[in-house]
């Protein structure tokens, strides 16, 4: 007779922010039910110090913790430390890498995303996605004199600013840095900070990093090559010493409008008899041949070649859907994520998805868009749990308010950065206006207006405008009569709209 299969009313896959938030919320809603959290990683990502800054803006820290800490906080959560080998959606069960089978009534897939690594398998190309890869990077950086960063997202931005004592060549395919987050004006504001020597003392980081014990690492059920850790948290570099071998503070050269064409190891490069460039030492960026030899050479599509100790691939992520697709006819979004509706349901019955793995396919609010960021992972995980609970009890549920307005607060180059609504005029066409206020080295304020209404904003620095602008975007009030006064620093804009 076949042994009974362990059943959980609710099974969540993924130990990142979306998965852990979903499991926690389900545990609160159903204290008598066992909630199974299946994760390939020996540590989970927990939200701590959560603070609702305004109606939609939120701040929190991300802490790595052993799964046992989650189980002690929620006695009805059982953490299963293993990757998923197969999902049989028709049978409502999953098989884990360690050979176990779990039956579910409702399943939420929160397996995150994988880095798009250029030249996978090359020992001189590092990707930074999880704590293990960040620590590997720190180890390599300690021996490095020069590295190249390829990519223009959040991790690339933070690396370019945080690395000290090492020459950094930063290759981006766009005209300006931080294209995902900023227009050319904001990029210029930040670039001046990047190119100046860092004088200010670093702000102490509140976030703690939990280091996995060596013994735990040895007992992992998956080989390191296959292991996909959940993404790094905000301030992920806070516990790392990002220092190269040299004594100078900061040295960055940006190559714009280019991508990697080819990578050569040292021996291969000698045979090719090509010329590489020395690191530009002056503001005029005079070009001279490099006399030094390097372990790896990177040829860019603009024709330039630089030698370096290693290359960091920070070119974005792809949804980690692969473990779940075999014999399961999921509908996928254009970006490869699992399509979800306004109740976080995938195209298969009783299967939900949240966080980086999913693609939001509902009709969005005019001032919201999906971006694979920490805040949305938490919001989606929380809302998915609410939807699963409502469906289990046969109750209707309204869309969560957090999807009314895109709102994200972060830090770049030691500046507070707030992004609201269509902050880069995404999808607005030519029919919009921009209003700007900039104090070099202090603050940058950009507002996106359409038909007299505020549609988005970028706030860099301590502007104290986020709550007022959030309300103006949500209310869609006609602001035509205020004109330039909206950004006049001598007028307290909050007084207008009390």
Swiss-Prot record:
Cofactors demanded by this protein: FAD
Free-text remark on how the cofactor is bound: Binds 1 FAD per subunit.
GO biological process annotation, one example: cellular response to oxidative stress
Record's subcellular location: Nucleus; Cytoplasm; Cytoplasm, Myofibril, Sarcomere
Keyword list, A-Z: Acetylation, Cytoplasm, FAD, Flavoprotein, NADP, Nucleus, Oxidoreductase
Pfam families on file: Pyr_redox_2, Rubredoxin_C
GO cellular component: cytoplasm; nucleus; sarcomere
Gene Ontology MF terms: oxidoreductase activity
Taxonomic superkingdom: Eukaryota
Modification sites for N-acetylmethionine: 1
InterPro entries linked to this entry: FAD-bd_OxRdtase, FAD/NAD-bd_sf, FAD/NAD-binding_dom, FAD/NAD-linked_Rdtase_dimer_sf, Rubredoxin_C
Keyword hit for NADP: yes
UniProt EC number: 1.8.1.-
Presence of keyword Membrane: no
EC top class, as a word: oxidoreductase
Family, similarity comment: Belongs to the class-I pyridine nucleotide-disulfide oxidoreductase family. PYROXD1 subfamily.
Task performed by this protein: Probable FAD-dependent oxidoreductase; involved in the cellular oxidative stress response. Required for normal sarcomere structure and muscle fiber integrity.
Protein name, UniProt field: Pyridine nucleotide-disulfide oxidoreductase domain-containing protein 1
């Amino acid at each position: 007779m076949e042994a009974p299969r362990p059943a959980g009313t609710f099974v969540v896959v993924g130990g990142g922010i979306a998965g852990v938030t979903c499991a926690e919320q389900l545990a609160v809603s159903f204290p008598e039910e066992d909630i199974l959290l299946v994760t390939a990683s020996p540590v989970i990502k927990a939200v701590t110090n959560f603070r609702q800054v305004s109606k939609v803006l939120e701040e929190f820290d991300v802490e790595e913790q052993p799964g046992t800490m989650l189980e002690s906080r929620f006695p009805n959560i059982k953490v299963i430390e293993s990757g998923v080998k197969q999902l049989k959606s028709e049978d409502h069960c999953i098989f884990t890498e360690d050979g176990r089978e779990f039956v579910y009534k409702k399943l939420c897939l929160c397996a995150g995303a994988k880095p798009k690594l250029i030249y996978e398998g090359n020992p001189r190309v590092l990707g930074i996605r999880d704590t293990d890869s960040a620590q590997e990077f720190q180890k390599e950086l300690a021996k490095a004199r020069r590295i190249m960063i390829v990519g223009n997202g959040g991790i690339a931005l933070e690396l370019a600013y945080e690395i000290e004592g090492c020459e950094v060549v930063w290759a981006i395919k766009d005209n300006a840095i931080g294209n995902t987050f900023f227009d050319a004006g904001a990029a210029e504001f930040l670039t001046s900070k990047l190119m100046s020597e860092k004088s200010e003392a670093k702000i102490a980081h509140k976030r703690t990093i939990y280091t996995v014990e060596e013994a735990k690492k040895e007992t992992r059920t998956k080989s390191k090559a296959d292991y996909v850790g959940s993404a790094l948290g905000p301030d992920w570099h806070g516990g790392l010493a990002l220092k190269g071998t040299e004594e100078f503070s900061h040295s960055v050269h940006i190559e714009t409008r280019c991508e990697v064409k080819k990578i050569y190891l040292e021996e291969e490069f000698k045979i090719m008899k090509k010329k590489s460039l020395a690191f530009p030492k002056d503001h005029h960026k005079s070009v001279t041949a490099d006399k030094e030899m390097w372990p790896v050479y990177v040829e860019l599509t603009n024709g330039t070649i630089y030698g370096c100790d290693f290359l960091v691939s920070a070119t974005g992520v792809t949804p980690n859907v692969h473990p779940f697709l075999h014999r399961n006819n999921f509908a996928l979004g254009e970006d490869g994520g699992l399509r979800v509706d306004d109740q976080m349901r995938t195209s298969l019955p009783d299967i939900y998805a949240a966080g980086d793995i999913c693609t939001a396919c509902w009709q969005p609010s005019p001032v919201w868009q999906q971006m694979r960021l920490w805040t949305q992972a938490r919001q989606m995980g929380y809302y998915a749990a609410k939807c699963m609970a409502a469906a289990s009890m046969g109750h209707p549920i309204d869309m969560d308010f957090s999807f009314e307005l895109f709102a994200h607060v972060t830090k770049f180059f030691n500046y507070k950065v707030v992004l609201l609504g269509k902050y880069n005029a995404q999808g607005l066409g030519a029919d919009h206006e921009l209003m700007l206020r900039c104090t070099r080295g202090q603050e940058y304020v950009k507002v996106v207006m359409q038909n007299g209404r505020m549609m988005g904003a970028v706030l860099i620095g301590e502007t104290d405008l986020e709550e007022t602008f959030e309300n103006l975007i949500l209310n869609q009030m006609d602001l035509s009569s205020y004109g330039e006064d909206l950004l006049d620093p001598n007028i307290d804009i909050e007084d207008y709209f009390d």
